[in-house]
Structures are given as structure tokens and as C-alpha cells.
Amino acid sequence: MKIVMCNGCFDLLHAGHVAHLQEARAMGDYLIVALTLDEFVNKGLGRPIYKWEQRALLLRELRCVDQVSPTTNGS
């Protein structure tokens, strides 16, 4: 099994994010999204707009995403 991983904050999920994740999933059999924890998002004041749990829920609803895991890597 080939596992692919993407990292990001995915705040305000948009079509570009979805296309990126679909392309990543097409490169393997299982896609893990490493989702940046709220306190490590460095997109400016007031970000993230959506809390980690909300962003994770949206990502998990995408057919191309197999797993969402927290990460401390800023994005």
C-alpha cells in the first residue's frame, strides 16, 4: 500500500484545496492529511477562522481523504 501525506491548515477550504487533495490521493492508496493545530496556524491575526475540529470534520467528508491527524507544523 502506498501512503501519501499532505500538510496544511486548510482554513476556509476551497476548490483549490480539494483539487490538491484529489491529486495527492491519486498518487497512492491512502491519503493522510496532517492538519495544523489552531495554536500553530500562522496566517495572521484572527486565524484560523475555523477551529481544528471544524476543519477536520470538513476534510473527513471528502472522499479522497482517508485520515486526518493533528500536526504542530505551522502553515
Regions found by a protein language model. Name each.
Residues 1-75:
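Nucleotidyltransferase catalytic core that binds NTPs
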